[in-house]
Structures are given as C-alpha cells and as structure tokens.
C-alpha cells in the first residue's frame, strides 16, 4: 500500500465527512446556536426594557410622592390660615363684645351719675329750703316748695 494512496483516501474521506457535516450536521447546529443567541439577546433586551420600565415607574412614584407632599403642605398651610382667620374673627368678636359691654356699662354709669346728681340737687335744694324756712321761720306751702325746688334745681 502506498502511503500516498492512503493519504489521498483519507483526504477524500475527510472531505466527504466535511461535506456531509456541512450539509447535514452544521445547519441544525448553527440554527440551534443562532436560536440560543436570539433567546439570550431577547432576554437581555427584555431585562433592559424591564430596567427602563422600573426606572420610569420609580421616577413616577417619586413625582407622585413629591406632588402629594406639596399638596399636603398646601392643605396644612390652608388649615393654618383658616385657623388664624378663625382666631382673628373670635378675637374681633370678643373685642366687639367687650366694647359693647363697656359702652353699655358706661351708659349705665352716666345715667346713674345723672340720676344721682339730680337727686343730690333736689336734696341740696330741700336742705337749703329747710334752712331758709327755719331762718325765716315761716311755713311755705308744698306747691310753693316744689316750684322753688324746681327753680333751684334748674339753676344748679
């Protein structure tokens, strides 16, 4: 056997084996590898999309939280303003009531003072009349007394 013929036979067998493999074994193997690459790429793309969706959801949640805090702060400020307004209104009402009571009391005091002055004037006039009556030692009738007292009160 010739070594060259053996090598040539082995080369032909190898070429036939390679052709057979390229025709029948290689395409399904490559299809399987490409399918697996596609699945991996789709999985990575899906993971990337999920990460982006998560980032978007977190950003939206943060925005909603900030908006809720702003709204809560606005509600608190509005409540504080309303509280201050109610307190101011209550103070104003109390001040008005106090002024009303003071004015009423002052009016009562003035009326009482006026009545006391009138009473005092009448008593002073009666005392003066009694003193004058004792000095003169004569009796004046009650109608004349009343006229004299009224005149004296009017003069005082």
Swiss-Prot record:
Keywords: ATP synthesis, Cell inner membrane, Cell membrane, CF(0), Hydrogen ion transport, Ion transport, Membrane, Transmembrane, Transmembrane helix, Transport. The chain crosses the membrane at residues 11-31. It holds the Pfam family ATP-synt_B. One of its GO terms (molecular function) is proton-transporting ATP synthase activity, rotational mechanism. One of its GO terms (cellular component) is proton-transporting ATP synthase complex. It is found in: Cell inner membrane. It is a single-pass membrane protein. InterPro entries: ATP_synth_B-like_membr_sf, ATP_synth_b/b'su_bac/chlpt, ATP_synth_F0_bsu_bac, ATP_synthase_B_chain. F-type ATPases have 2 components, F(1) - the catalytic core - and F(0) - the membrane proton channel. F(1) has five subunits: alpha(3), beta(3), gamma(1), delta(1), epsilon(1). F(0) has three main subunits: a(1), b(2) and c(10-14). The alpha and beta chains form an alternating ring which encloses part of the gamma chain. F(1) is attached to F(0) by a central stalk formed by the gamma and epsilon chains, while a peripheral stalk is formed by the delta and b chains. F(1)F(0) ATP synthase produces ATP from ADP in the presence of a proton or sodium gradient. F-type ATPases consist of two structural domains, F(1) containing the extramembraneous catalytic core and F(0) containing the membrane proton channel, linked together by a central stalk and a peripheral stalk. During catalysis, ATP synthesis in the catalytic domain of F(1) is coupled via a rotary mechanism of the central stalk subunits to proton translocation. Component of the F(0) channel, it forms part of the peripheral stalk, linking F(1) to F(0). NCBIfam families: ATP_synt_b (TIGR01144), PRK05759.1-2 (NF004411), PRK05759.1-4 (NF004413). Belongs to the ATPase B chain family. This is ATP synthase subunit b.
């Amino acid at each position: 056997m010739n070594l060259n013929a053996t090598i040539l036979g082995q080369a032909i067998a190898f070429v036939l084996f390679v052709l057979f493999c390229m025709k029948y074994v290689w395409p399904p193997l490559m299809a399987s590898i490409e399918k697996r690459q596609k699945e991996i790429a789709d999985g990575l793309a899906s993971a990337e999309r999920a990460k982006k969706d998560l980032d978007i959801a977190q950003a939206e949640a943060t925005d909603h939280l900030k908006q809720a805090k702003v709204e809560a702060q606005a509600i608190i400020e509005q409540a504080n303003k309303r509280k201050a307004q109610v307190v101011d209104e209550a103070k104003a009402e109390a001040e008005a009531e106090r002024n009303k009571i003071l004015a009423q009391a002052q009016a009562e005091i003035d009326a009482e003072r006026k009545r006391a002055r009138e009473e005092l004037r009448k008593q002073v006039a009666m005392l003066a009349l009694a003193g004058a009556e004792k000095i003169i030692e004569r009796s004046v009738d009650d109608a004349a007394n009343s006229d004299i007292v009224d005149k004296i009160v009017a003069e005082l």
